[in-house]
Every structure is written in structure tokens, then in C-alpha cells.
């Protein structure tokens, strides 16, 4: 890439840069734009709210309405707390679980992503046992004691995770999982998640679904609806704000009492100047009401087209002996350069990183843009003819790699 791309405008399935180049957008704002860029209900709601004012510091009726919509979407949710990002949401959720249980350790799964605060930037050590991973910090500036003493890693899609929870139940405040991992998007997780819910109940350990990415995208009710599982805590972000900054902590009254101190529950400190921001509330209400009303049309379409992209690209790679595979969970997808079977992030090799980098440069040349993390999304605005163009661009980019000698 000769220089960084800067976006000037967006409309439906497209982004346009400062030079006037138009791209099919597979970023979707890193996931929030479920119905496309500049969704009309959101644009109208924002315009209306701006006329009334855009920051008050005092709660308004819009907070109650958005909270009610989120509650209605999930039987696991009794109460809701708003913040400004998915990272803030997971940070507050970890704190709430520790306060309620009096226990210190929070468990995450290998390959997961839960934000940018210190307790989330913990990963499985690459050289550790796959079925019993040890923890290390991700990036500098995070005390080692966090990964060693306050966090633990569990193996993803591995039943030994259940035994580790049983072994450490007296120290475990919370088990956190992306029900569909962003690094490994797939939907065949029912059996593993059912087992996880059962063992957490057995061991009296709180279970949290991090639905920052999947909430209101996999289904209107997120992965909770798709798998019919009720966690104790849920975090939301992205789509819940209609493209405006948002984080949401939600869950059972027992856990959420830690935010209010009700029923003599230990109370955590939580707050923020922009929590429940009027523009975010307006956008969130508009998009959730739209998604709720049209869910029987929107979500089957997103699954159908996401599956079509993955199926056609995987068939092309197999028939042309290309070591790559498209993994997808409905409308979220990740092209992984590996011909091996993938069960967890441990199976993803980075040996073809240079090939992967060149691929996305070629894809950009075919006017399709994917975020730098290579987790791609489509929206309801990506109609079948747009999806056809996406598939064609992927195929042409693979052919470009072969011509360049990378494959």
C-alpha cells in the first residue's frame, strides 16, 4: 500500500476515500453496522436528537428505552448498565464478578479477545500445554502478577476446560467466553457451550458471554438466542449503539446489584462522563427497534449470504489447491491461510503471513476493503449482486497471488 487510506464518506455497502475511490466495505465499522453504512433510522434519530441537545450529564428517558430493548432481547438480562466501549463493559463486568463472589480469578479462553484493559490483555503462552494453557500478558506495561495471579486461561473447544474449572472453582469468580470467537468464527459450538454452562452451574462459578461483537449480529438475541443458553453476565457493544460508541454490562439482578448496592450487595465503583450519551442512546434505540421489527428478514439473509461467501471461496481454494479457508459465523468471517483443520486459535499458523499481507493488498486493488485485523463482516446492505462482486474479488486476488509466485 503506497499510503494510508482515509475515508471521506460511507453509504450502504460502500466506503469512499479522500481520492474518490469507492470500495465494497467488509469492515462494517468493525462490526456495528449490521444494516449498512448511514442506516436511515439511525441518521434520522441522530438528527432529531442533535436538535434537542447532545450532552447533558443527567439521565434521560432514552436510557430507559434502550435498556428495555436490551432486556427484551434476552431472558438472561434483568438489568443494564451503560458505558462507552466494549473494553469498559468487560472491565466493569470482571469487577462486578469479583465483588459479588469475593473471589479473585477470572478465566478467559485461548484465542479470545475482550478489550484493551489490563485484565483483558492476557493470552495463552504459545509454548504451554494446549489442554492446560498458562497465562502471559499481551504487550508491555502490564504487571506480570495480573496474568500469573489474577487471570487464568482455559482451552477453547476442549473439554479439559471443564476439569480446570472444577479444579480452580474455589478461586474462580468468573468464566468469560466469546460464544463465537472473533479469531475463529464458527457456529458449531453448541455442545461445548452447553457443557460450559453446566459445569459453571455445578461449581457455582459465574458465566459471562462477551457478546460485544456477536450481540445483535448473529441473531437479534445474539448467541444467547442462537444457542438457547442463559449466562449470568453479558457484555454488549458495537451493534447495540448503532455505530455510536457504546458498552453495555447486563445480567441477572443478583450480579447487577453490585452496581447499585441493592440487597446489601458489595458495591463497585462505576461511572463515566459520557455513559448513556444522548446521541448513542438515540442511535441504539433506532437500530434495535429496526432490527427487532425486521429480524425475520435480516438475520436469515445475513446467514445465507455469509455462508454463500464462505462456501464459494472454500470450494475455489480446494479446487485450486490454495492453502486457505474461509471460516464464518453467519455474517462475520475470517480468511485463514492454512489448509489444516482448525479447532482453535492454536491451529492457526502465521507462517504464511507474507502471503496473507499480499492477498489483502490485491483485494484492495479489486476495490474490496477488509479491516487490518482481517475479521470481515457483511451487512444487510450487501445485496446478492454485491456479494457476487466480493466473491469474484477474492478469487481474482488468489489468482493474482499465483501469478506473483506466492502460491
Feature-to-residue mapping (PLM):
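Conserved N-terminal phosphate-binding loop of PLP-dependent enzymes in the Aspartate aminotransferase
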Residues: 1-407
Amino acid at each position: 500500500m503506497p499510503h494510508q487510506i482515509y475515508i471521506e464518506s460511507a453509504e450502504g455497502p460502500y466506503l469512499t476515500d479522500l481520492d474518490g475511490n469507492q470500495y465494497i466495505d467488509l469492515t462494517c465499522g468493525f462490526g456495528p453496522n449490521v444494516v449498512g453504512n448511514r442506516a436511515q433510522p439511525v441518521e434520522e434519530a441522530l438528527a432529531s436528537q442533535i436538535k434537542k441537545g447532545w450532552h447533558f450529564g443527567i439521565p434521560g428517558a432514552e436510557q430507559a428505552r434502550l435498556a428495555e430493548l436490551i432486556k427484551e432481547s434476552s431472558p438472561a438480562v434483568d438489568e443494564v448498565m451503560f458505558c462507552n466501549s466494549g473494553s469498559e463493559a468487560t472491565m466493569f463486568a470482571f469487577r462486578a464478578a469479583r465483588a459479588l463472589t469475593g473471589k479473585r480469578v477470572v478465566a478467559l479462553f485461548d484465542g479470545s479477545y475482550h478489550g484493551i484493559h489490563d485484565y483483558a490483555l492476557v493470552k495463552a503462552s504459545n509454548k504451554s500445554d494446549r489442554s492446560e494453557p498458562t497465562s502471559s500478558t499481551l504487550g508491555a506495561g502490564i504487571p506480570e502478577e495480573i496474568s500469573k495471579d489474577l487471570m487464568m486461561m482455559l482451552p477453547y473447544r476442549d473439554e479439559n476446560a471443564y476439569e480446570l474449572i472444577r479444579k480452580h472453582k474455589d478461586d474462580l469468580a468468573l468464566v468469560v467466553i466469546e460464544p463465537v470467537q472473533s479469531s475463529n468464527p464458527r457456529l458449531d459450538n453448541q455442545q461445548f457451550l452447553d457443557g460450559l454452562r453446566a459445569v459453571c452451574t455445578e461449581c457455582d462459578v459465574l458465566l459471562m458471554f462477551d457478546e460485544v461483537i456477536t450481540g445483535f449480529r448473529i441473531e437479534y438475541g445474539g448467541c444467547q438466542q442462537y444457542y438457547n443458553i442463559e449466562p449470568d453476565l453479558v457484555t454488549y457493544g458495537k451493534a447495540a449503539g448503532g455505530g455510536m460508541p457504546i458498552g453495555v454490562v447486563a445480567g441477572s439482578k443478583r450480579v447487577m446489584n453490585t452496581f447499585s448496592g441493592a440487597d446489601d450487595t458489595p458495591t463497585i465503583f462505576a461511572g463515566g462522563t459520557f455513559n448513556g450519551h444522548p446521541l448513542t442512546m438515540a442511535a441504539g434505540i433506532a437500530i434495535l427497534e429496526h432490527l427487532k421489527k425486521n429480524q425475520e428478514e435480516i438475520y436469515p439473509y445475513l446467514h445465507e449470504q455469509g455462508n454463500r461467501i464462505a462456501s464459494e471461496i472454500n470450494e475455489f481454494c480446494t479446487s485450486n489447491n490454495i492453502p486457505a479457508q474461509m471460516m464464518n459465523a453467519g455474517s462475520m468471517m475470517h480468511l485463514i491461510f492454512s489448509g489444516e483443520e482448525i479447532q482453535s486459535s492454536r491451529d492457526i499458523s502465521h507462517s504464511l503471513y507474507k502471503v496473507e499481507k499480499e492477498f489483502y493488498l490485491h483485494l484492495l486493488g479489486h476495490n474490496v476493503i477488509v479491516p487490518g485485523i482481517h475479521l470481515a463482516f457483511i451487512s444487510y446492505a450487501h445485496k446478492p449482486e454485491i456479494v457476487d462482486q466480493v466473491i469474484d474479488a477474492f478469487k481474482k486476488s488468489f489468482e493474482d497471488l499465483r501469478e506473483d509466485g506466492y502460491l
